[in-house]
């Protein structure tokens, strides 16, 4: 991305509002001396038309950043607005919690072509708990301070969302766009391999997501 490198200097701070983990490492070769500010996004947005977007809040905060100079600089940009910013000294744990939420919410809705109502099924809940337990083990290996019952907490949070809410991957499927699969399930499988932590369920999910995403990239929306 030469255009991005050209915009970055030693005093530049680049906020990355993207799902997943390891943003700074992924962007290091593109931003030169600029500082990367990983930013967690909690709200849900659905494009209803060219000039219409449905905005839904999904918790007490809209963004989360690390409580460091970069995070504080990002938060200051939104002073005086209605956006609610959490600054945390343990950003890694927050990032993993959001990743865990996304690793069930996005894939399951996209693969089943159903909105959040699909998580009301007991069999889907059981599958989600197994996927989450596996992913949480990887997160702990990576240094995230996740609770022993983190999987149950994440699923409980998901079940508070409106049944008609969608996810970014679900909307990508409807629009015929490839998925951001490598940043979500792909990141869990890759991190698990790095720590020699087995991820059979997430690896199976990754295979299905890649197959579906590749078909969308080829123009097959079925």
Label each region the model flagged.
Residues 10-14, 62-63, 194:
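Short active-site oxyanion
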Residues 51-75, 125:
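Short beta-strand and adjoining strand-loop segment in the mid-core
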Residues 1-52:
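Rossmann-like NAD(P)(H) cofactor-binding subdomain of soluble oxidoreductases
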Residues 79, 129-222:
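NAD(P)-dependent Rossmann-like dehydrogenase/reductase catalytic/cofactor-binding core
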Residues 40, 44, 50-52, 59, ...:
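Active-site substrate-recognition segment that forms the wall
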Residues 92-137, 162-163:
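Active-site-proximal catalytic alpha-helix in oxidoreductases
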Residues 72-106, 153-154:
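FAD/FMN-dependent oxidoreductases across multiple families
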């Amino acid at each position: 991305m030469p255009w991005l490198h050209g915009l970055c200097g030693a005093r530049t701070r680049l906020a990355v509002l993207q799902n997943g983990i390891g943003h700074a490492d992924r962007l290091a070769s593109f931003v030169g001396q600029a500082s990367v500010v990983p930013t967690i996004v909690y709200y849900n947005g659905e494009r209803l038309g060219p000039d219409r977007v449905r905005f839904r809040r999904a918790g007490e905060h809209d963004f989360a950043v690390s409580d460091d100079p970069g995070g504080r600089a990002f938060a200051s940009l939104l002073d005086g607005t209605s956006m609610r910013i959490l600054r945390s000294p343990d950003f890694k744990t927050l990032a993993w919690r959001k990743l865990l939420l996304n690793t069930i919410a996005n894939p399951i809705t996209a693969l089943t072509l159903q909105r959040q109502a699909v998580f009301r099924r007991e069999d889907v809940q059981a599958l989600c708990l197994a996927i989450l337990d596996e992913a949480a083990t990887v997160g702990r290996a990576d240094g995230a301070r996740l609770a022993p019952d983190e999987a149950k907490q994440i699923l409980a949070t998901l079940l508070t969302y409106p049944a008609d809410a969608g996810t970014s991957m679900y909307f990508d499927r409807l629009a015929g766009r490839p998925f951001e699969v490598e940043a979500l399930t792909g990141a869990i499988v890759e991190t698990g391999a790095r720590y020699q932590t087995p991820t059979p369920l997430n690896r199976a999910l990754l295979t299905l997501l890649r197959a579906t995403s590749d078909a969308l990239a080829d123009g097959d929306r079925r």
